Curated annotation (Swiss-Prot):
Residues 442-446 are annotated as: G2. PANTHER family: TR-TYPE G DOMAIN-CONTAINING PROTEIN, TRANSLATION INITIATION FACTOR IF-2-RELATED. Residues 56-74, 121-131 have a biased composition (Low complexity). NCBIfam families: IF-2 (TIGR00487), small_GTP (TIGR00231). One of the essential components for the initiation of protein synthesis. Protects formylmethionyl-tRNA from spontaneous hydrolysis and promotes its binding to the 30S ribosomal subunits. Also involved in the hydrolysis of GTP during the formation of the 70S ribosomal complex. It is found in: Cytoplasm. This is Translation initiation factor IF-2. Gene3D superfamilies: 1.10.10.2480, P-loop containing nucleotide triphosphate hydrolases, Translation factors, Translation initiation factor IF- 2, domain 3. Residues 417-424 are annotated as: G1. GO terms for molecular function: GTP binding; GTPase activity; translation initiation factor activity. GO terms for cellular component: cytosol. The keyword Cell membrane does not apply. Residues 408-579 form the tr-type G domain.
Amino acid sequence: MAGKARVHELAKELGVTSKEVLARLSDQGEFVKSASSTVEAPVARRLRESFGGGDKPAPAASNGAAAEAAAPPKKAGPKPGAPKPAPKKVAEPVVEAPVAPEPPAAPAAPAAPAPKPSPAARPAAAEAAAPAPAPAPAPRPGATPGPKPGAPRVPRVGNNPFSSAQPAERPAPRPQAPRPGAPRPGGASPSNMPPRPSPGSMGPRPPRPGGGPRPGGGPRPGGAGRPGGGGGGNYRGGGTGTGAPAGGPPGAGGGFRGRPGGGGGGGRPGQRGGAAGAFGRPGGAPKRGRKSKRAKRAEYENMQAPVVGGVRLPHGNGEVIRLARGASLSDFAEKIDANPASLVQALFNLGEMVTATQSVGDETLELLGGEMNYVVQVVSPEDEDRELLESFDLTYGEDEGGEEDLRTRPPVVTVMGHVDHGKTRLLDTIRKANVREGEAGGITQHIGAYQVAVEHDGTERPITFIDTPGHEAFTAMRARGAKATDIAILVVAADDGVMPQTVEAINHAQAADVPIVVAVNKIDKEGADPAKIRAQLTEYNLVAEDFGGDTMFVDISARQGTNIEQLLEAVLLTADAALDLRANPDMEAQGVAIEAHLDRGRGPVATVLIQRGTLRVGDSIVAGDAYGRVRRMVDEHGEDVEEALPSRPVQVIGFTSVPGAGDNLLVVDEDRIARQIADRRSARKRNALAARSRKRISLDDLDAALKETSQLNLILKGDNAGTVEALEEALLGIAIDDEVQLRVIDRGVGGVTETNVNLASASDAIIIGFNVRAEGKATELANREGVDIRYYSVIYQAIDEIESALKGMLKPVYEEVELGRAEIRAMFRSSKVGNIAGCLVTSGIIRRNAKARLLRDNIVVAETVTISSLRREKDDVVEVRDGYECGLTLTYNDIKEGDVIEAYELREKERV
């Protein structure tokens, strides 16, 4: 059969059922699905042979070689009168040869002189090769007798449809190393191999037709042990066998390409050789090249890579990865050359839900890095800012030049203390001005810087004073004041003692390693006890010189001006004795923004304290994420200043935006550099803010996060950056309950604009204006959109009102209050209303439509029952008091005499 055949056609041809054919194919190791499936030609041929139908294709042979091969051998073999199945078996490949995809010029006769002929085929092979001179002796016919006529047919081992020669039988394979790779589909296996002829029926192997031993020595790669191995070579280009006659047919020998004596299947260059399997690759197992060291190393590293959350990730081997605070998974993946999606999936499997571009907290980055054996270092903002400046060849915090370039500068003194202890009054007395009257509520809500010339030992010496707020909401301002100062004056009221903000100011000063001079104020008031103040401050390591310590105490009265000169003298003595107050004025200026605000006419205005160098008009400056050029400088008296030396506070005009309070100020060469530094700081600030404000949601608390929560959105506007910052921190510090959240969606310096109103309208927010008012048509727009704008001038009023608003947003909590009890004395039945209970009120009040529960033998029978109707003397009443009888109906009918009805109500409880 030249092509594919279906199973049911083969069954019809062989005269058996399709099930028998399928069973036989299964025994032979062929997987065939159904009777309508097709099988290849070699499989069909083996199937016919197994059913005894292998002689059907024999009449197709019409050449002389087949007839000559059909002749029995002369000396040995089957009897003359016996049927000759074996010669037909030899002639069968001749019929199949033209069907193979080889050139038709290849004759069928060379099938006989195969390099390893079976014993039954050797006489026929010798006769077929007779016309050519053969120096090698012919094989001995008697050594290998053919199969007996009655012997069972042995199906061929190979099933290669492209082979040009098919032996009738194969001897036992020679011992050789097994070939790599799995056996071919049509090859012999222990499960489908037919029984071999007995060893006694086979003589010793005759010599090869080519004569001497095959070059190369060892077993032929295409030998009998290879399934499907015949005379066919492995690849194209095979030549004539070594021992083949000169004029013999080409391709007489088999072997690999390039091997001496290797013959091709067809003997023609460029022709495809025989395949090892029925439908397999040419030549059997594929040729495998050796892997490079790089490929092996990559494969090994991939196998050794850690698996985090079911995802295979790179192995860090303890490598240190530096990430900025608020970095995203994309930034982390870029550092370790990984796929961001893999990091997202790994975190998700670990219970953390983030996106690739979302800012991630420090703990999450360190956790993920530890799983991959990376050491993640989250760079602090200070280190990151230093690295940013180093990238522009800039430094901050160091004086340029040597010791000879340093000049003495005035001391910077910060006045600190509890609220209403007299700090601003003291500064007013020193400056001979009145600053306190300008503050709302009599408390300082801004930070101010002034320079005052003080006469000391006949010499006028300047001192820079920084006034910080004492209210508890201005912790950050006090911290900034302590960092920018040289000496701290701690003001303590003699009649009030040490207060919480006093302790906080001490901690700020000690943390900044700043010497403290204590000013005991209000000694002129009744009840003043300076000795008590000295005793209290010893608990905080502030021991007076009178007690053997090194802290200077001065008793003053800011209102009366008592001992002010002694206080200034103590400040100067401390500065001269304990501090090295020198700076280089001949360098580009560096300083700190003490305060900043937005002025309607002048734009962003920053109060800057110069720490080193000289700031001049026209310099390119950058402070935090704000940059610009100095257009104007004004001192504390409102006069223009052309240059500011170290320790000089000035107001700088020329920023493009309002800098943050406490930002470092730096002079650069070009506006371009200032803009680049500001842009990078702004991006870093946004990432850090996003990482801080993002609430981590894990898979465990996902259900709780999805529950409905109340949220109060706020927009903060103030007159300066420090006040807005303090107000935001104070509001975010209000702790009410998890059910209510406070969110500041926008903040800024300046008046309330229409943009703020539109944002508040879109997000249902409340606008808080601190010392500012609405601009232009913002008020009309707010009234039209229904936006609530609250104005405050004292910070604690804003905090109290926002806290009250948050409490009002809490879900109400109800508590149960018992109203009274009634005992059922009689039962009445009505077809309209059901059971009617005749009751006696034993305590309290029974009220109509009140909640009730039914008790029977002090056991609750029914809960959440409602008193649907209530009557007294045939009149409908609202309530019945203690000692009276009544009739009532419940929404529960299973009542009995002796039951007790307990009425109660739920009252809303105030949340605190």
